UniProtKB/Swiss-Prot annotation:
Through its interaction with host SGS3, acts as a suppressor of RNA-mediated gene silencing, also known as post-transcriptional gene silencing (PTGS), a mechanism of plant viral defense that limits the accumulation of viral RNAs. It comes from Indian cassava mosaic virus (ICMV). This is Protein AV2. Belongs to the geminiviridae protein AV2/V2 family. It comes from the Viruses. Disulfide bonds: none annotated. GO terms for biological process: negative regulation of gene silencing by regulatory ncRNA; symbiont-mediated suppression of host innate immune response.
Length: 112
């Protein structure tokens, strides 16, 4: 967790609350598998908290809230069935690591 003797203290009370919220969400995030809806919703909350201005944060929160309201509590721990196009998701890192490195890919060379 955050150690106030080793790290700088936030300049405002709002910054302090955001820092505590991020630390709490990091602990909650560990309880969800990376391929679940709950994990995605927690990642969305990170983006809401870390938004730089009010308009951006409000927009992100409305998107988060509509996704949360459209799902039941039992769906939060179930794997997401729709594919995501993001190359940075933990779900995609798993598939990249599954590829064996010693396999060379064939190239088609035309005869001259």
């Amino acid at each position: 967790m955050w150690d106030p003797l080793l790290n700088e203290f936030p300049e405002s009370v709002h910054g302090f609350r955001c820092m505590l919220a991020v630390k709490y969400l990091q602990l909650v995030e560990c309880t969800y598998s990376p391929d679940t809806l709950g994990y995605d919703l927690i990642r969305d909350l990170f983006s809401v908290i870390r938004a730089k201005n009010y308009v951006e944060a409000t927009s992100r929160y409305h998107n988060f809230y509509s996704r949360l309201e459209g799902s039941s509590p039992s769906e939060l721990r179930q794997p997401i069935q729709q594919p995501c196009g993001c190359p940075y998701c933990p779900r995609h890192k798993k598939t990249i690591l599954d590829k064996q490195t010693h396999q060379s890919e064939a190239q088609v060379v035309s005869d001259v």
